């Protein structure tokens, strides 16, 4: 039977050495699901609340309160329920929390349980996780968006944009796409070192050189692509995560590295110029999370030429996404499971996007773990795109390696998205 008999929460550490939540769900038939919860650095103001303890322990970042909720109230509520009823379980936890943003029990508590329940149910049915969540139609291997230069709050450098990504749109398989990315990553490392820049990596495994402008970062990446023998725009496209909320000040965008302010119109014009100059096919959070007018202006300007992704704008929240769809803001949504706090709400956001013709991109967080859940989620939803960092750090590679395994499991049914979904 797939009845929940025990739920165990524990405090472990994430990739930044900060506490996070791990949950085990045990079923009556002996099946076990274990999940770890990620954490963001550039968090949107409208995200579900990650419950931290405060005080001096772990500099206030402990998660004992969330663990107590899991081992107490949540276990009491969910014990005896069928793990296959994902929606019912998630709704029960949301009702138990009783707040609009999961602030009482913590989104980190609810998410850990939600994901572990899905894993336990899949295990009990002897199904791969992607197949359990996505059914028989799950077969699209996502095009990876590989963050090989880090800036913003993900790195200790003056670059204002948070991520500079390579996207292997011309590869024929997921495994080949990962090889393309690894070769460019190592070539970039050598070129940076030869130019006198340090090659330490940021939170997501990308390099964090002391560049002062986006153009400088992009030029180094372009040179590395060409040095590897690949064709920019044809085999390798580029993507940006501006994380513009982080440098939005009093109605303008302040570029600290350049010492320059850009008003809303100038910000739109700047991004439009970048996609003319470089083979950039996707821009995430090009405007601040509450600059709705700016988002509409940006979408009207370049939305037919470029994927415009709302991360902080939508925070994996179907209600905010519907507002954006009505307004014509952005044309895609970034999906982060911990922004909303349950698997069923995450899947609802993906479905809402797809029904409206918006793309959905499954994403990691800057504070990650060895858990590879999002790799299975990307295939389960046939989203066709995934962001899971650079080609360094085991917390990032865990997801790439799981995608390689899934591609092998799917065999002839496997279909690499390439540029179809970008």
Swiss-Prot record:
Protein's cellular compartments: Cytoplasm; Secreted; Cell surface
Annotated active site: 204, 336
Cofactor annotation comment: Binds a second Mg(2+) ion via substrate during catalysis.
GO terms of biological process kind: glycolytic process
SUPFAM superfamilies linked to this entry: Enolase C-terminal domain-like, Enolase N-terminal domain-like
Annotated InterPro entries: Enolase (IPR000941), Enolase-like_C_sf (IPR036849), Enolase-like_N (IPR029017), Enolase_C (IPR020810), Enolase_CS (IPR020809), Enolase_N (IPR020811)
Name the UniProt record assigns to this protein: Enolase
UniProt source species: Bartonella henselae (strain ATCC 49882 / DSM 28221 / CCUG 30454 / Houston 1) (Rochalimaea henselae)
């Amino acid at each position: 039977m797939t009845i929940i008999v025990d739920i165990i929460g524990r405090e472990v550490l994430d990739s930044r050495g900060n506490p996070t939540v791990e949950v085990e769900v045990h079923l009556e038939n002996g099946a076990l699901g274990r999940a770890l919860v990620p954490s963001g650095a550039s968090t949107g103001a409208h995200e579900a609340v990650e419950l931290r303890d405060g005080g001096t322990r772990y500099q206030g970042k402990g998660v004992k309160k969330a663990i107590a909720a899991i081992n107490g109230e949540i276990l009491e509520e969910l014990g005896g329920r069928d793990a296959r009823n994902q929606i019912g379980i998630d709704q029960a936890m949301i009702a138990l929390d009783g707040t609009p943003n999961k602030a009482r029990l913590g989104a980190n508590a609810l998410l850990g349980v939600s994901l572990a329940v899905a894993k336990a149910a899949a295990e009990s049915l002897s199904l791969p996780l992607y197949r359990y969540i996505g059914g028989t139609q799950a077969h699209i291997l996502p095009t990876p968006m590989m963050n090989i230069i880090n800036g913003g709050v993900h790195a200790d450098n003056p670059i204002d944009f948070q991520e500079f990504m390579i996207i292997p749109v011309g590869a024929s398989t997921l495994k080949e796409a990962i090889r393309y990315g690894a070769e460019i990553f190592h070539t970039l490392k050598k070129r940076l070192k030869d130019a006198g820049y340090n090659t330490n990596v940021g939170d997501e495994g990308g390099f964090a050189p002391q560049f002062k402008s986006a153009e400088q970062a992009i030029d180094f990446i372009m040179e590395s692509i060409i040095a590897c023998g690949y064709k920019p725009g044809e085999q390798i496209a580029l993507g940006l995560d501006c994380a513009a909320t982080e440098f939005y000040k009093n109605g303008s965008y302040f570029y600290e590295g350049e010492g320059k302010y850009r008003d809303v119109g100038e910000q739109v014009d700047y991004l439009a110029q970048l996609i003319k100059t470089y083979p950039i096919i996707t821009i995430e959070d090009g405007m601040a999370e509450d600059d709705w007018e700016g988002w509409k202006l940006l979408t009207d300007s370049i939305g037919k030429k470029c994927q415009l992704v709302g991360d902080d704008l939508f925070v994996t929240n179907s209600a905010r996404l519907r507002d954006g769809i009505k307004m014509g803001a952005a044309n895609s949504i970034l999906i982060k499971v911990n922004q909303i706090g349950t698997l069923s709400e995450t899947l609802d956001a993906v479905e809402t996007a797809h029904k409206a013709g918006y793309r959905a991109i499954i994403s990691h967080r800057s504070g990650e773990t060895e858990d590879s859940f999002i790799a299975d989620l990307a295939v389960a939803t046939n989203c066709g795109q995934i962001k899971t960092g650079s080609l360094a750090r085991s917390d990032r590679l865990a997801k790439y390696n799981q995608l390689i395994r899934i591609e092998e499991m799917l065999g002839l049914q496997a279909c690499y998205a390439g540029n179809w979904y970008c």
